[in-house]
Amino acid sequence: HLLPQSSLWQGATLLGEIAWNRRLSITKNAAALDPNTTRDATAIRVVFEPQYFQVLDGVDISVPIGLGYTIDGRSGAVGAFGPEHGGDFSVGVKGDFMKVWRFSFGLTHYFGSAGPIAAGGIQTFKQIYRDRDFLSFAATRTF
């Protein structure tokens, strides 16, 4: 969704997604299903990105802010759906100079109860990236 100009930004976008899945039935080999999964699982992801134009001569920037969270359930239908009651938060700065040079800097933080992907052959649905927060930087040039 494009947001109109305000006193806090010159332009902005707001994106959102709700994901839900349900396992309807199991026709064969039901014993192979992980007993820690649930029939339903629900998650959300939201990204808000205010934009600022001509901050310096020829420089436009934006500040993407994102949040992903598994609201409910432990998906038996989608393998990497997310940790139960966990997710990630990210914030960054993106910019361009004269629409030729583009740069970005970001921080991603993972939250939720930490744990391994599986214990005793059963998925834990814990946050396996809890200790993997990271910074990223990229620069590109068009020609």
Where are these regions (language model features)?
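Outer-membrane beta-barrel "beta-signal"
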Residues: V100, Y129-F143
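Extracellular loop and loop/strand-boundary signature of outer-membrane beta-barrel proteins
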Residues: A31-N36, R74-A80, P116-Q127
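Residues on the lipid-exposed face of transmembrane beta-strands in outer-membrane beta-barrel proteins
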Residues: H1, V46-Y52, I65-L67, V91-G95, ...
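Long, well-ordered mid-to-C-terminal structural blocks that present hydrophobic/aromatic surfaces
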Residues: H1-P35
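C-terminal beta-signal and adjacent terminal beta-strands/loops
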Residues: F97-V100, T108-I122
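Residues that define the transmembrane beta-barrel architecture of outer-membrane proteins
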Residues: T38-I44, P83-F89, D131-L135
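Short loop/turn motifs that connect adjacent beta-strands in outer-membrane beta-barrel proteins
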Residues: H1-L14, F53-S62, G95-V100
